[in-house]
Amino acid sequence: MTLESIMACCLSEEAKEARRINDEIERQLRRDKRDARRELKLLLLGTGESGKSTFIKQMRIIHGSGYSDEDKRGFTKLVYQNIFTAMQAMIRAMDTLKIPYKYEHNKAHAQLVREVDVEKVSAFENPYVDAIKSLWNDPGIQECYDRRREYQLSDSTKYYLNDLDRVADPSYLPTQQDVLRVRVPTTGIIEYPFDLQSVIFRMVDVGGQRSERRKWIHCFENVTSIMFLVALSEYDQVLVESDNENRMEESKALFRTIITYPWFQNSSVILFLNKKDLLEEKIMYSHLVDYFPEYDGPQRDAQAAREFILKMFVDLNPDSDKIIYSHFTCATDTENIRFVFAAVKDTILQLNLKEYNLV
């Protein structure tokens, strides 16, 4: 074999290798492009305590790995802290609302619980268990609980305080429902990616309190869908940050802002009217018309109330071509969220994947 033919052979091998590398790069670029299409970004928005974090927990239960016993154990301290936080809020409100304790001994119990530094709570033992039990059974505290719209109290208060014996058991392990009910204000941004039908859904939860909202802005690129949560039960409540502003008015103002943002022009909007279970309870004694005088429907009618609230939000949409998809939800009810999210997923996939022939 001559030198020339050996060189030609080597060259063609090199050329082949170069072409192979080039083809591989092209293939990878095509793959990346396709994968980018297959990742859908869902932005969870809504005011503080509307249920966004609970919704993410449900995605982990329904479409992810769920919560192992070890994971659940990690919530034990938070459950204890939620109980102390709730009782302290009611003890403070007893003073503010000038409600007396029915039983004299509960004043000492209140003092004991009031002095606890909640951040440092890591156990739930006596004398605190008995003190909190005794306080919860005091008619004064029960009256204070009934007036909770006048101050800030977690929605999970009754759930935990009605189950103190179980939580106080030394072998207590939080249940899935306990995990769903734990309240930890979201600071910063939480992302939860999960895989469905070879499509990655990346759900992004941002803090709802006003101080957290300035951090949202960089989440707004390439958003497939806005999922906006409203707590139906907030029609008679005031804001954490400002006690003379109605929470639902704040939620409406935020929704109006979000749906008119120019960078959401191509994002679908899904409205979750959440906490429908709490609305059903509350509507029996707290009348919608007292807070929204334009309501002219029947009193004590949860169905009429929620339809009115839905219409209030849908009417904020200035673009008649843009459909707002809506669902009534209870974020702590796994079966309800499983059912609702199946419908939402179909909506999102149909709207966004038709053009890529992936459905």
Swiss-Prot record:
Originating gene: Gnaq
Region (G3 motif): 201-210
First-tier enzyme category under EC: hydrolase
GO biological process, alphabetically ordered: action potential; adenylate cyclase-activating G protein-coupled receptor signaling pathway; cranial skeletal system development; developmental pigmentation; embryonic digit morphogenesis; endothelin receptor signaling pathway; forebrain neuron development; G protein-coupled receptor signaling pathway
Keywords recorded for this protein, A-Z: Cell membrane, Golgi apparatus, GTP-binding, Hydrolase, Lipoprotein, Magnesium, Membrane, Metal-binding, Nucleotide-binding, Nucleus, Palmitate, Transducer
Residues where 5-glutamyl histamine is found: 209
Entry-linked CDD domains: G-alpha
Phenotype on disruption: Mice are viable but suffer from cerebellar ataxia and display deficiencies in primary hemostasis due to a defect in platelet activation. Mice lacking Gnaq and Gna11 are embryonic lethal due to cardiomyocyte hypoplasia. Mice lacking Gnaq and with one single intact copy of Gna11, as well as mice lacking Gna11 and with one single intact copy of Gnaq die shortly after birth; lethality is caused by heart malformations. Newborns display craniofacial defects.
Effect on the protein upon substituting residue 10 to S: Abolishes palmitoylation
The name this protein goes by in its record: Guanine nucleotide-binding protein G(q) subunit alpha
G4 motif: region residues: 270-277
Keyword Transmembrane among UniProt keywords: no
Domain G-alpha: 38-359
Region annotation G2 motif: where it falls in the sequence: 178-186
Subcellular location: Cell membrane; Golgi apparatus; Nucleus; Nucleus membrane
Binding locations of Mg(2+): 53, 186
Annotated residues for binding of GTP: 50-54, 156, 180-181, 183, 274-275, 277, 331
Molecular function per GO: alkylglycerophosphoethanolamine phosphodiesterase activity; enzyme regulator activity; G protein activity; G protein-coupled receptor binding; G-protein beta/gamma-subunit complex binding; GTP binding; GTPase activity; metal ion binding
Lipidation (S-palmitoyl cysteine): 9-10
The family this protein is said to belong to: Belongs to the G-alpha family. G(q) subfamily.
Job of this protein: Guanine nucleotide-binding proteins (G proteins) function as transducers downstream of G protein-coupled receptors (GPCRs) in numerous signaling cascades. The alpha chain contains the guanine nucleotide binding site and alternates between an active, GTP-bound state and an inactive, GDP-bound state. Signaling by an activated GPCR promotes GDP release and GTP binding. The alpha subunit has a low GTPase activity that converts bound GTP to GDP, thereby terminating the signal. Both GDP release and GTP hydrolysis are modulated by numerous regulatory proteins.
Membrane-topology annotation of the record: Lipid-anchor
Assembly notes: G proteins are composed of 3 units; alpha, beta and gamma. The alpha chain contains the guanine nucleotide binding site. Interacts (GDP-bound form) with RIC8A (via C-terminus); promoting GNAQ folding and association with the plasma membrane. Binds NHERF1. Forms a complex with PECAM1 and BDKRB2. Interacts with GAS2L2.
Spans annotated as G1 motif: 41-54
Sequence intervals crossing the membrane: none
